[in-house]
Amino acid sequence: MSVYGKIPSTSFEHENTFELSGDLLDPEELKSLGVSGRIIYVLRHLPFKSSINEETREWDLSGRRGATTMYSSMNWLANSTYWQTTLVGWTGVIPTVSEKEENKDAVTRLDSQDVKRFEETYSQWNSGERSTEYVPVWLPGPEKGSETIINETRSQQSRWLAYAENVIRPLIHYKYWPSSEVDENEEQWWRDYVKMNHAFADKICEIYKPGDFIIVQDYSLFLVPQLIRNKIDDAVIGFYHHHPFPSSEIARCFPRRRAILRSVLGADFIGFEDYSYARHFISCCSRVLDLEIGHDWVNLNGNKVTVRAITVGIDVPRIIRSSGNVSVSEKLEELNKRYENMKVILGRDRLDELYGVPQKLRSFQRFLRTYPEWRKKVVLIQITISSAFKHPKLLSSIKKLVQAINQEFGTDDYTPVHHVEEQLEPADYFALLTRADALFINSIREGVSNLALEYVVCQRDRYGMVLLSEFTATSAMLHDVPLINPWDYNECAEIISNALSTPLERRKMIERESYKQVTTHTMQSWTSSLIRSLANKLAATKTDQRIPTLTPEHALSVYSKASKRLFMMDYDGTLTPIVRDPNAAVPSKKLLDNLATLAADPKNQVWIISGRDQQFLRNWMDDIKGLGLSAEHGSFVRKPHSTTWINLAELLDMSWKKEVRRIFQYYTDRTQGSSIEEKRCAMTWHYRKADPENGAFQALECEALLEELVCSKYDVEIMRGKANLEVRPSSINKGGIVKQILSSYPEDSLPSFIFCAGDDRTDEDMFRSLHKNTRINKETSFAVTIGSDKKLSIADWCIADPANVIDILADLANFTN
């Protein structure tokens, strides 16, 4: 039978304490979990821009556009619920304004007094009884022995975002490195990125109180979760990614992919806008980091990080209020007069190649050419908003296309494309959303578009159509709207024509379903789901008992007093790291030297109990004569100070191997990168070098077939290891060897120091045998699992990794010397 049949599933999975959807949890409901009632939002920017007057040293603050959902979520919690909110964000680039001269790149010099005045100025943003507390992050921050906080030009200050915007952002949107500038500057940009993330993490740790929830958001702060975890191990950390996440083929192009993925996995919960993005992230963790994964989790050192899609939304009540005020009605009346008897298509995009404005214009041009009956009856209002990072070539190509379309189809009284290059005031924006007969979103790659959701709300009972790129996360939310491929101009032209002539009943049906989706998946429901996800992780952590870490000092204090000592240690993953090629997992000189020292001490008995075959152990450890060796999970044993190997499986029936070999060969043939290892008493199918997802899938099928055809006829068991399946006799396991070793000691002369260490499920048999022996003093016996203290194991102690195990062995060996 499979050893998995012996372990109840509840040992490895926790049921959710709280439903993932539903009303917002009250902090009072979570009091028993130690929740403080405060949520620390971590965003790239504070919600306002700032500048300082060079002469008066007075600050000027103005609202920052963008990140609407995050700011709305935070303000809703602060003003309408019992949660307290704190926002940690960068001040952004701070320009100096001079009354004497205009210098767009003047040096900004700030000291501690300027910072104090800044805090006094932004306190006005905190008006109200329960508003959000703002905590600024200053970059580069004070230098040692100096009160200077900033002494840089605007362009120098903008460097903190260079890595995020020039390397990460293009790649997560499926765009490869665009220029040699990235190659030349990547290393320096990365150093700035790391420094910025450290500054954020330091500020968060400075204000953190036990029981706070921390929610870090977006790619500018990928490193922050692990940096916080390094300082506050029990912090409850969520990370939400508001953009696409690419497939592993693209993600592997990240020059710092391992550091980024491991850092994000410092969070307890990772959220994405779309299920496909979550799956891509999980797949990347498997393919790049070689981690164990599940449907909605990634296992990092025994800690299961939850990875799920939570659909982000908008603040619907706010949009309804904003779009229904008097000033919007006045603007709408003006638009109705200006575009009387005309169909209006609206486009609103950042000036960025990812938003597909040139493709949109070409599609509109193709539409007017293909369907001449629509000429003089439809206009495209394209609003293009400049971004912090300028794109002069893109803007030039857009202007040329607009000019070409207007020259080809325009007349004295008809201009087909109206191009607006500025951010609209709210009244103008909502009036356009209300007036437009269609919204045209043509993004090459985009997450959830707030524009589309706000349009649906503004079109209540007006039945305008959303033309939506299939490459946006919004397409999974608005199921019934026409989806377009930005690169297929003919199809886009046809969809535009069909949308403008769609019968009223069909438009009503689409509007009804879209409105239902938008009003169901709101900013409030998104916030509630985030908090529930963090509460579930916290509840699971409280249910689990963390395994205490064995320190070198504690091990040495017991070791130094013992007259008899026993070491029983696994090899792979315990004394050496797990690697893709098992043949590369060779012992270090430091390990061999320390094993030799410990084995030479007459007070010690040292055993390596491994799944490796005899030949491997002979090759690397045969020279250490005082070392006991057990190969193939206990099938073969060489006692300390002996050269003879004993075959404990000599009398066992091995006829099952022929059937297992046939099954393993079948799966090797269909799984590229897999291989068979035939030992004398066991057979192992390795798939570590195979595609991770295909290998895991084939392993499940292979295991099921072995259960049916082999385990039903022979006394064997299947062991699933790290990227391998092993079949072995049921009577042979590591626990049996531990039992034999302990029984070799007289009743009244057991070791007063026992160190038993292993990293995977096969080693749980060793711990089980140790625990069953009632003669052992539990205070001086250490059953140690290698990995996270959150790992599911029956071990009494944990050590983080093989390097730390070797360090402890070195300390004990030094005492022996």
From Swiss-Prot:
Region (Glycosyltransferase): 1-547
InterPro entries: Glyco_trans_20, HAD-like_sf, HAD-SF_hydro_IIB, HAD_sf, Trehalose_PPase
One Pfam family hit: Glyco_transf_20
Keyword Hydrolase: yes
Cofactor: Mg(2+)
Observed effect of gene inactivation: Increases cellular trehalose-6-phosphate level during thermal stress.
BP terms from Gene Ontology: trehalose biosynthetic process; trehalose metabolic process
GO cellular component, one term: alpha,alpha-trehalose-phosphate synthase complex (UDP-forming)
Metabolic or biological pathway: Carbohydrate biosynthesis
Top-rank lineage group of the source organism: Eukaryota
Induction: Induced by thermal stress, and osmotic stress (at protein level). Induced by oxidative stress.
Keywords: Hydrolase
Family: In the N-terminal section; belongs to the glycosyltransferase 20 family.
Function of the molecule: Phosphatase catalytic subunit of the trehalose synthase complex that catalyzes the production of trehalose from glucose-6-phosphate and UDP-alpha-D-glucose in a two step process. The disaccharide trehalose serves as a storage carbohydrate that is mobilized during nutrient stress and spore germination. Together with ntp1, regulates the level of trehalose as a protectant for cell integrity during thermal, osmotic, and oxidative stress.
NCBIfam families in UniProt: HAD-SF-IIB, T6PP
Annotated protein name in UniProt: Trehalose-phosphatase
Species of provenance: Schizosaccharomyces pombe (strain 972 / ATCC 24843) (Fission yeast)
